[in-house]
Structures are given as structure tokens and as C-alpha cells.
A protein has these predicted regions:
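Internal, active-site/partner-interface "lid" segment
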Residues: 125, 139, 166-188
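Single conserved hydrophobic/aromatic residue that forms the stacking wall/gate
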Residues: 1-8, 13
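N-terminal beta-alpha supersecondary unit
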Residues: 14, 20-21, 47-48
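Serine-centered coil/turn micro-motif
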Residues: 22, 121, 182-183
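Glycine-rich phosphate-binding loops that contact phosphosugars or nucleotide phosphates
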Residues: 36-43, 47-164
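A short, well-structured juxtamembrane/interface segment
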Residues: 19-34
Length: 188
């Protein structure tokens, strides 16, 4: 298990360096140009990663929050405004709950950044910019449980957050403001 995790994680990190090109720069420009908040969404394991990405963005100077796509279809779309930007995660890029939101996002006229494992997926094709977070195989010996694919998405999300932190000139003092408790708060 340890070896599978090591190999899977190394593969994800190695493969991300080749995807940090023009689409990544475009995604950064969309996020920097957002006057509202960055709304991050995803279903299943991608949803857990989306929540972590939203939290990391928010704690490093980019206002962001997570919206569950199932809840968005039942009223929570009201949380998303015309001044926001959406980052949608789906490894397949064809997750029904995410695809249901696409016409609503388009109606708002806000940027849609997709993060999927396939450039040809419906979500990737609908997005204003697509970030490819593909992997050859999952670390799971059955090649089923989202393992390497979620690591790839997490790495891409962290890269976005750090790029935004640097672009905004976010300081340790600002970081301390959003981390008043815990070990990080004490350290700052």
C-alpha cells in the first residue's frame, strides 16, 4: 500500500509540470479578474477535493467557497452571483450533477474553469478554460477507487492557490488574520 501511494503521488506530481501551461495561466487570469468569489464544486471524491481547494484558496487570499452540485440543483445556485467564477471538478468530466449546472452557469455569464481527467469530456468542452488532471492509472490495485486522480486534482488546486497567493502579494500577516487558532495561528 505504501509503495502504491508513493508511486501514484510521484506520477501525479511529475505529470502536473507538463500541464501548467497556457490553460493554467488563463485560469489564473479568470480567478484574478473575479470581483466576487470563486465557487468550487465537485461530486463524490472530487467534491471532497473541491472543498479542500476552496478552503485553501480562501485561506490564502482568494475568497472562495464550496457548493455541492446536488444542493445547487435544489436552491443553492442562489449562492452563485454574476460576479463569481466557477471551478468544477469531475474526473470523468461527465458527472450528471455537474453537467446539470452548466446551463445555469452559462446563463449567469460567469467564467467556468473545469478540472477533469479528459480533454474531450462534456465538462471540458463547455468550460472557458480546462485544466487537465489526468492520470494513467489509479493507485488502487483495482484501478477503481479515486486515488491518483484525486491527488492530481489536489496538486492542481494547490498550484492555483499558490499562484494566486503570489499574484496578490499575500503576506504572512494576512495569512495570520485567517488563521487565529491552532498551530499555524500560534506560529504567526
Amino acid at each position: 500500500a505504501i509503495e502504491l501511494c508513493r508511486v501514484g503521488s510521484e506520477m501525479c506530481i511529475r505529470d502536473r509540470s507538463s500541464t501548467l501551461g497556457p490553460p493554467f495561466a488563463s485560469a489564473c487570469r479568470y480567478i484574478l479578474g473575479t470581483t466576487g468569489r470563486v465557487v468550487v464544486t465537485g461530486m463524490g471524491k472530487s467534491g471532497h477535493i473541491a472543498g479542500k481547494i476552496a478552503a485553501t484558496l480562501a485561506s490564502t487570499g482568494t475568497p472562495a467557497f464550496f457548493v455541492h452540485p446536488g444542493e445547487a440543483s435544489h436552491g443553492d445556485m442562489g449562492m452563485i452571483t454574476a460576479s463569481d467564477c466557477v471551478i468544477a471538478l469531475s474526473h470523468s468530466g461527465n458527472t450528471h450533477e455537474i453537467l446539470t449546472l452548466l446551463p445555469l452557469i452559462k446563463r449567469l455569464g460567469i467564467p467556468l474553469i473545469s478540472m477533469t481527467g479528459s480533454d474531450t469530456s462534456e465538462l471540458a468542452q463547455a468550460a472557458d478554460v480546462h485544466l487537465l488532471a489526468s492520470v494513467e492509472t489509479e493507485a488502487c490495485p483495482l484501478n477503481l477507487a479515486p486515488t491518483s486522480s484525486t491527488t492530481a486534482a489536489l496538486v492542481m488546486g494547490d498550484a492555483l492557490a499558490i499562484a494566486m497567493l503570489e499574484a496578490r502579494g499575500f503576506t504572512a500577516e494576512e495569512f495570520a488574520f485567517s488563521h487565529p487558532g491552532g498551530a499555524l495561528g500560534k506560529r504567526l
